[in-house]
A protein has these predicted regions:
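Terminal peptide-recognition signature
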Residues: 26, 49, 66, 97, ...
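Short beta->alpha transition motifs characteristic of CBS
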Residues: 1-11, 54, 67-84, 124, ...
Length: 153
């Protein structure tokens, strides 16, 4: 029996999940995510990330609705707080905090491949991957947490 046939007959098992589950199956849809503008103030970024309870927010191109230009995670926020003295915090904007042009994936990618990209990133570990369409518009976010919860370890 081939791995693909096994996956069809045992979709809930680890091998079945690895061979059948896509990013689309696990991503958080864009409608549930806080959207930020590059000019969003630091206090508003903190408020939106706290309300969202997702640990990240996406920054959209103000001239092209829905097009991703950056991503802000809890880690980006902590680094900005550490690197800037407190009298500068109120003057920071989303564009100062965000990871510009983050690594992205498409919704059709196999979830296990997305997990490998997160684990083996050269610059720093990735806990959140933006999911975009062919036009760079955000479709959702894929969190490492969701991959682990789905049993893709």
């Amino acid at each position: 029996i081939s791995p693909a046939d096994f996956a069809i007959n045992h979709p809930a098992g680890s091998l079945g999940k690895q061979l059948t589950m896509t990013v689309a199956d696990l991503m958080l849809p864009v409608s549930s995510l806080p959207a930020l503008q590059p000019s969003t103030s630091m206090p508003d970024v903190i408020s939106m990330l706290t309300q969202g309870a997702i640990g990240s927010g996406w920054v959209e191109d103000p001239g092209s609705r829905g097009r991703l230009v950056g991503l802000i995670t809890d880690g980006d926020l902590r680094r900005a707080l550490k690197e800037n003295n407190s009298d500068r915090w109120a003057h920071l904007q989303a564009s100062d905090l965000m990871t510009a042009d983050p690594i992205t994936v498409t919704s059709e990618l196999m979830a296990v491949e997305a997990m490998k990209r997160m684990e083996h990133n050269r610059r720093k570990p990735i806990s959140v991957l933006p999911v975009v369409n062919a036009h760079g518009q955000l479709e959702g976010l894929l969190r490492l947490h969701d991959l682990v919860q789905a049993g893709l370890t």
